[in-house]
């Protein structure tokens, strides 16, 4: 049987939008933990403004994610490809933060129903999220199909707050298969100036994914914006909650520079003839005050919008 991780990666790349909202079966199989470390156990966390925010500037739209904030600066909800993910908080709260219980979304389309729930959050002493659990389920009465999965994330960071490693573990089942599981990790490498150089995905001792960056111009990332081009492609293409938390700054500080190119490679240990490569050519439009107005990937443009600490849009 072909390597499960590679098959799921290929499927995600070919049907990105469809996967995200209608077939999350492949979510996170692409990036699970090889390590024997225990996934941290969490629960409610104090959830306010992350330490990655510079001068109060926060995104309301970036990398296809649209974010709405409460008056106290906490996130109300986020929209990803037309699906709204709601941030659920405890009734009691302190000034500047709330107790985050879960992030949830539901979607129905004819005879198909889907549900996402992220919970069991871990908040580290550096102010960033150290882990969470994502549960997904889907039932399609039209095709007599169902599937369920649970993904557990663990994040570690460098001393300067930049993400260093993502460990993951997943268990799943569906209408055809019994329960099964997988694991793997992503590792990040930076240069001496704080620019992201490489992301490597491994599973069971095999490197199946590499994402390497090139810099030809000196574009400073003034407001520490975590564009999703600075995260693993096969993870951002399959997990909407990861996308939201990354863009809003809860998964660490971003690369200090913005790359102009990314070279991606996907490897299959059993069928090397199916290995693939891809190149992203990255272009940015940056305002005179350092805010990213938009960026493009191979010509496809993504709008970015930001607000200041007073919730006023920055022009």
Q: How should these model regions be labeled?
A:
Residues 35-315:
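Buried hydrophobic residues that stabilize the cores of well-folded domains
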Residues 1-2, 33:
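N-terminal hydrophobic targeting signals that begin at the initiator methionine
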């Amino acid at each position: 049987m072909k390597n499960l991780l590679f098959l799921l990666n290929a499927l995600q790349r070919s049907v990105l939008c469809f996967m995200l909202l209608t077939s999350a079966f492949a979510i996170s199989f692409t990036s699970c933990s090889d390590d024997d470390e225990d996934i941290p156990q969490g629960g409610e966390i104090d959830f306010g403004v992350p330490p990655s925010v510079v001068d109060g500037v926060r995104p309301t739209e970036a990398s296809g994610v649209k974010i709405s904030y409460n008056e106290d600066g906490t996130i109300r909800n986020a929209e990803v490809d037309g699906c709204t993910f709601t941030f659920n908080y405890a009734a009691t709260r302190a000034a500047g933060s709330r107790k985050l219980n879960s992030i949830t979304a539901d979607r129905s389309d004819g005879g198909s129903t889907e549900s996402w729930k992220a919970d069991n959050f871990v908040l580290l002493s550096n102010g960033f999220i150290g882990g969470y659990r994502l549960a997904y389920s889907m039932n399609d009465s039209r095709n007599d199909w169902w599937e369920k999965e649970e993904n557990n994330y663990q994040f570690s960071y460098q001393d300067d707050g930049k993400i260093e490693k993502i460990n993951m573990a997943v268990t799943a089942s569906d209408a055809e298969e019994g329960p099964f599981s997988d694991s793997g990790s992503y590792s990040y490498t930076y240069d001496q100036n704080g620019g992201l150089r490489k992301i490597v995905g491994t599973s069971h001792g095999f490197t199946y994914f590499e994402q390497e960056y090139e810099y030809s111009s000196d574009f400073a990332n003034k407001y520490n914006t975590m564009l999703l081009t600075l995260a693993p492609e096969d993870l951002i293409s399959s997990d909407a909650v990861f996308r939201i938390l990354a863009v809003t700054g809860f998964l660490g500080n971003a690369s200090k520079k913005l790359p102009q190119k990314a070279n991606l490679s996907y490897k299959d240990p059993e069928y090397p003839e199916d290995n693939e490569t891809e190149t992203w050519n990255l272009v940015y439009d940056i305002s005179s005050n350092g805010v990213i107005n938009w960026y493009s990937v191979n010509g496809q443009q993504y709008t970015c919008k930001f607000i200041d600490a007073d919730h006023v849009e920055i022009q």
